[in-house]
From Swiss-Prot:
Component of the small ribosomal subunit. The ribosome is a large ribonucleoprotein complex responsible for the synthesis of proteins in the cell. Gene3D superfamilies: 2.30.30.30, 2.40.50.740, RNA-binding S4 domain. Pfam families: 40S_S4_C, KOW, Ribosomal_S4e, RS4NT. InterPro entries: KOW, Rib_uL2_dom2, Ribosomal_eS4, Ribosomal_eS4_C, Ribosomal_eS4_central_region, Ribosomal_eS4_central_sf, Ribosomal_eS4_KOW, Ribosomal_eS4_N. GO terms for biological process: translation. This is Small ribosomal subunit protein eS4. Keywords: Cytoplasm, Ribonucleoprotein, Ribosomal protein, RNA-binding, rRNA-binding. Belongs to the eukaryotic ribosomal protein eS4 family. One of its GO terms (cellular component) is ribosome. Residues 42-104 form the S4 RNA-binding domain. It is found in: Cytoplasm.
Length: 263
């Protein structure tokens, strides 16, 4: 009988977006328990070793982390399998670099560099609101933060802006048609567009229709929608491609055009 948590993760069973090859080994780093789900996070070791190439082995990553160089959301993290996830800010003091984890249109976490100014805040989606003991209102965000005494206008599915130094809410965006959003799950993962309408289906999943900057429309579940800006002004800098997914033919044409201009 299995007692206790699983401690291993086979490479073949690891999430596809980590982009690990099957043949280099048997195991993958199993993320620690933390604010993001196992299949929706990127362990620190993969970010530092496989994406940034700052280390060649897991041992080297451990040495980097143990010198307390790596901060996630303003807190030093020494656990190499710490699960960083969507919207997290990773700062490396030594090099003065800051990254925000956001999806590219292929549904992977892009290495998206940001300025020191932008690294001071993050956006969080409100998952749940309730009134606790002694009538204190609370809300819970997508990255497992519990915040007491929020603005009474903030409801579930809205997005709040959090100052990472204090953990306080500085601003919020209502979930509303006409606002800019990013898709954080499903087949349209990583696409960015403006919310056009919301179909309510009581007892089932609400469906949200989104239109991207090229005028392509698509629909996804409400739970996959993360509002990132008022109107069409995003509150964070967007990764390369601006969240517009190209068809295979469009990608080919773009590649050929780039080849001709350089050749």
């Amino acid at each position: 009988m299995a007692r206790g948590p699983k401690k291993h993760l086979k490479r073949v069973a690891a999430p596809k977006h980590w982009m690990l090859d099957k043949l280099t080994g048997v195991f993958a780093p199993r993320p620690s328990t933390g604010p993001h789900k196992l299949r929706e996070c990127l362990p620190l070791i993969i970010f530092l070793r496989n994406r940034l190439k700052y280390a060649l082995t897991g041992d080297e990553v451990k040495k980097i982390c143990m010198q307390r160089f790596i901060k996630i959301d303003g807190k030093v993290r020494t656990d190499i399998t710490y699960p960083a996830g969507f919207m997290d800010v990773i700062s490396i003091e030594k090099t003065g670099e800051h990254f925000r984890l956001v999806y590219d249109t292929k549904g992977r976490f892009a290495v998206h560099r940001i300025t020191a100014e932008e690294a001071k805040y993050k956006l969080c989606k409100v998952r749940k609101t309730w009134v606790g003991t002694k009538g204190i209102p609370h809300l819970v965000t997508h990255d497992a933060r519990t915040i007491r005494y929020p603005d009474p206008l903030i409801k579930v599915n809205d997005t709040i802006q959090i100052d990472l130094e204090t953990g306080k809410i500085t601003d919020f965006i209502k979930f509303d048609t006409g606002n800019l959003c990013m898709v954080t799950g499903g087949a349209n993962l990583g696409r960015i567009g403006v919310i056009t309408n919301r179909e309510r289906h009581p007892g089932s999943f609400d469906v949200v229709h989104v239109k991207d900057a090229n005028g392509n429309s698509f629909a996804t579940r409400l739970s996959n929608i993360f509002v990132i800006g008022k109107g069409n002004k995003p509150w964070i800098s967007l990764p390369r491609g601006k969240g517009i997914r190209l068809t295979i033919a469009e990608e080919r044409d773009k590649r050929l055009a780039a080849k001709q201009s350089s050749g």
